[in-house]
């Protein structure tokens, strides 16, 4: 097989894999389905440890994406729907989408949560029609084992993010560059 044929095969396979594994607006979840998934994800998040419960209770808002699908082979895509929670109640619904190119392979389903630790960071997020993680507002990713001493007295960043509940295997998963957009449900 020639290099150009091999390259075309890899590109076609990547696009095919991405198209078949990632949800689209045709598969958009209903409001009640999103709310149900959020309740399950919030319980799972709280069960990760007492400091996650503290972070949940002390945050000005939480952007919860209970089911994000990510997949790719060189070209990767991800998509999910969730809600912005204030006082642990959904106030607005959002989608998250990303596309990337580089060393990545596999498929994964996961949940993600972005904790807004101040009213100011929450207001900045809500003011924008769309929001790109890492470009529009800085954030710090939390490893599940790192939430040992994080509380409202030690916040040093406006936004903290965590990925949890992973199923499947996808090398190269990141939230960086993910685009969050308000949706109607």
Predicted regions and their residues:
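N-terminal secretory signal peptides and thylakoid transit peptides that target proteins
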Residues: 1-16
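Generic hydrophobic alpha-helical segments
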Residues: 16-17, 180
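Small-residue-enriched, tightly packed secondary-structure blocks
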Residues: 28-185
């Amino acid at each position: 097989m020639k290099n150009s044929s091999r390259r075309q095969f890899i590109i076609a396979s990547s696009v095919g894999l991405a198209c078949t594994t990632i949800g689209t607006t045709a598969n958009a979840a209903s409001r009640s389905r999103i709310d149900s998934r959020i309740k399950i994800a919030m319980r799972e998040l709280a069960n990760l440890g007492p400091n996650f419960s503290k972070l949940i209770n002390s945050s000005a808002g939480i952007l919860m994406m209970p089911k994000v699908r990510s997949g790719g082979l060189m070209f990767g895509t991800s998509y999910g729907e969730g809600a912005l929670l204030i006082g642990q109640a959904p106030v607005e619904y959002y989608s998250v989408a990303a596309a990337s190119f580089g060393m990545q392979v596999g498929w994964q389903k996961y949940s993600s949560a972005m904790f807004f630790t101040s009213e100011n960071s929450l207001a900045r997020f809500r003011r924008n029609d769309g929001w790109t993680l890492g470009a529009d507002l800085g954030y710090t990713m939390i490893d599940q084992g790192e939430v040992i001493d994080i509380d409202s007295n030690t916040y040093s960043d406006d936004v903290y993010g965590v990925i949890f509940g992973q199923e499947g295997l996808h090398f190269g998963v990141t939230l960086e560059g993910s685009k969050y957009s308000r949706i109607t449900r």
